[in-house]
């Protein structure tokens, strides 16, 4: 997670909750929040950033809680889907989890993958985060 946060100047002490669930729980979340009745690999839930805000310093736009901590949001990963994707991509499960965690954090920082250009940008940033995490 730190490898994703560093290039985006996320303030020290900013928190992200990372949760792992099974496919059934992920399907329920995906249906409830995205109206898609199937499992998915990762979902992110965070405070709404102002329109057009993404990337460097995006987290600084969020107000700290009473404890002074900025809670960037929650990232939920389907453990089973991560394992399937790791096998398909022929890389370790730890790399897939790092990629999915980075992907989730990027969403919390205002990035989107609904367009081709947004998808390519997030894919490149996610791969960069995994490479940084390996060093």
Model-predicted segments: where are they?
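Active-site rim/adjacent substrate-binding subdomains
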Residues: 1-96, 108-135
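Catalytic glutamate of the conserved HExxH
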Residues: 100, 104-108
């Amino acid at each position: 997670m730190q490898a994703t946060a560093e290039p985006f100047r996320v303030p020290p002490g900013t928190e992200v909750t990372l949760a792992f669930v099974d496919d059934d729980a992920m399907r329920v979340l995906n249906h409830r929040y995205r109206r898609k009745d199937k499992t998915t690999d990762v979902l992110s839930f965070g405070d709404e950033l102002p329109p057009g805000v993404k990337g460097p310093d995006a987290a600084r736009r969020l107000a700290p809680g009473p404890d002074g901590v900025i809670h960037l949001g929650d990232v939920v990963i389907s453990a089973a889907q991560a394992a399937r994707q790791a096998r398909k991509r022929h890389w370790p499960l730890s790399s897939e989890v790092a990629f999915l965690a980075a992907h989730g954090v990027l969403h919390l920082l205002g990035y989107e993958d609904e367009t081709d250009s947004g998808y390519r940008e997030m894919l490149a940033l996610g791969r960069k985060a995994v490479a940084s995490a390996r060093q």
